[in-house]
Amino acid sequence: MADNMTTTQIEVGPGATNATINFEAGILECYERLSWQRALDYPGQDRLNRLKRKLESRIKTHNKSEPESKRMSLEERKAIGVKMMKVLLFMNPSAGIEGFEPYCMKNSSNSNCPNCNWTDYPPTSGKCLDDIEEEPENVDDPTEIVLRDMNNKDARQKIKEEVNTQKEGKFRLTIKRDIRNVLSLRVLVNGTFLKHPNGYKSLSTLHRLNAYDQSGRLVAKLVATDDLTVEDEEDGHRILNSLFERFNEGHSKPIRAAETAVGVLSQFGQEHRLSPEEGDN
């Protein structure tokens, strides 16, 4: 985020999770209305369907933790989300809803709101996408796999073996692909595994994925947002398998980190996080 940009702090009342789900439901409503107008292209339609599936899954999970009186359907959350957008876009207190009011400072001189002066605050301290450290956050006993002079099949098998030893909880996985002393792929993955009673393991959340090109330059950084959170077990395996398969395609040329980054990004509709030059690599 540029230094001269500002953000408006928002108080979300009953909890950030509820506010986020409701807001994304409002976004879904906008997507659907655009689709009804036949103004949504094919990638947009894919994003609409993906967002709807993720929201339905997340709402189902979230409602289980809420008292029955507070559980809401997707349609109810859509209505609240649209109202939230009015607050955010127009900063209009009359559009506000209970538990969600824009942050303001008391100032009776403002004509739009007798008691408030709408103010933009400098960004809060913390890391934005472009400022994230290259190494994932600290994790106990991180796993590092160095693949030297291995063919693709052996490399894939070694990664699988290492991943299968992960215990429940957060993990960090560093993959270094080294063929004839040429670093052709380096991927850092940070996520959370779940271990099930039957011994089955699943990747519940992908917190971060960094991909580097052959020169060691960072090609792509993924951080945890809702659409980068794996909502079901099979998605977790699909994401990791997409990485493994990069080692097993049998290409004569070294596998590039950019290829892996594009492959993973595309699963989330996040290709725009790569520059055109990186996307062409």
UniProtKB/Swiss-Prot annotation:
Where does this protein reside within or beyond the cell? Answer: Host cytoplasm; Host nucleus
Single GO molecular function: protein serine/threonine kinase inhibitor activity
**Which stretches of sequence are listed as region G1P2-binding?**
1-103
Q: Which InterPro entries match?
A: NS1, uS15_NS1_RNA-bd_sf
What does the record note on quaternary structure? Homodimer. Interacts with and inhibits human G1P2 conjugation by UBE1L.
Q: What does this protein do?
A: Binds and inhibits the conjugation of the ubiquitin-like G1P2/ISG15 protein to its target proteins. Since G1P2/ISG15 is an early antiviral protein, NS1 may inhibit the host antiviral response. Prevents EIF2AK2/PKR activation, either by binding double strand RNA or by interacting directly with EIF2AK2/PKR. Also binds poly(A) and U6 snRNA.
> What protein name is recorded for this chain?
Non-structural protein 1
